[in-house]
């Protein structure tokens, strides 16, 4: 299908990384600054709705809920789609908490195009409890970060690692998204 001149191609940005690294905050900051559409984290809705911790049997429902939210947002074709998370987080949490994950998560992840992953480091910011978080130890969050980075590199996903204090994270993320938005589309 030929692209009409002057019509921007949707760019999809994913915030990834361990808990308490600023993903939701940064997604909201990006949305406020650049506009577009932001998709939240389905697992938070799931836990709030069911009022209990998750188990391995919940992972397919959580992943399908996340996909439904993402796909509904994609269907609207915003100039910029900001995802607070995606299936990689569901996969890694399932592995971390339950030692297993539904194999179809890999296929679904690789079937979708993501223009940029902003991978947030656990370094330089404090872990904050919020009733759903469970990795207060920096070593655990570092392992989650490394698992995310390893997957992205293995699957040749575009990634920018975001580090530093909150102001530095915001500045780095804004610069990466700005660069993405001015780059020519190749899709």
Locations of regions flagged by a protein language model:
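Conserved lysine of the Walker
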Residues: 23
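A glycine- and Lys/Arg-enriched "phosphate-lid" helix/loop adjacent to the NTP-binding pocket
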Residues: 98-168, 181
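Hydrophobic anchor at the beta1->P-loop junction of P-loop NTPases
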Residues: 15
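P-loop (Walker A) phosphate-binding loop of NTP-binding proteins
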Residues: 18
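Conserved substrate/cofactor phosphate-moiety recognition/catalytic segment
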Residues: 28-71
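Pre-Walker A (Motif I) flank of P-loop NTPase domains
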Residues: 9-12, 78
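C-terminal accessory "lid"/substrate-recognition subdomains
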Residues: 4-7, 160, 168, 174-187
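Glycine-rich phosphate-binding loop used to anchor ATP phosphates in small-molecule kinases
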Residues: 61-112, 127
């Amino acid at each position: 299908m030929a692209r009409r001149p002057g019509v921007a191609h949707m760019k999809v940005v994913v915030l990834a990384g361990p808990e308490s690294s600023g993903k939701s905050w940064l997604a909201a900051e990006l949305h406020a600054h650049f506009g577009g559409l932001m998709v939240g984290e389905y697992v938070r809705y799931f836990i709030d709705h069911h009022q209990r911790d998750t188990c391995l049997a919940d992972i397919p429902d959580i992943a399908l809920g996340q996909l439904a939210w993402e796909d509904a947002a994609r269907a609207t074709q915003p100039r910029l789609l900001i995802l607070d998370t995606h299936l990689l987080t569901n996969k890694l949490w399932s592995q971390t908490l339950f030692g297993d994950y539904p194999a179809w998560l890999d296929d679904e992840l690789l079937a979708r195009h993501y223009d940029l992953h902003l991978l947030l480091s656990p370094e330089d910011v404090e872990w904050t409890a919020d009733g759903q978080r469970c990795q207060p130890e920096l070593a655990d969050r570092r392992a989650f970060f490394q698992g995310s980075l390893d997957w992205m590199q293995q699957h040749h996903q575009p990634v920018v690692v975001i580090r530093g204090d909150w102001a530095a994270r915001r500045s780095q993320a804004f610069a990466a998204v700005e660069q993405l938005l001015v780059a020519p589309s190749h899709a």
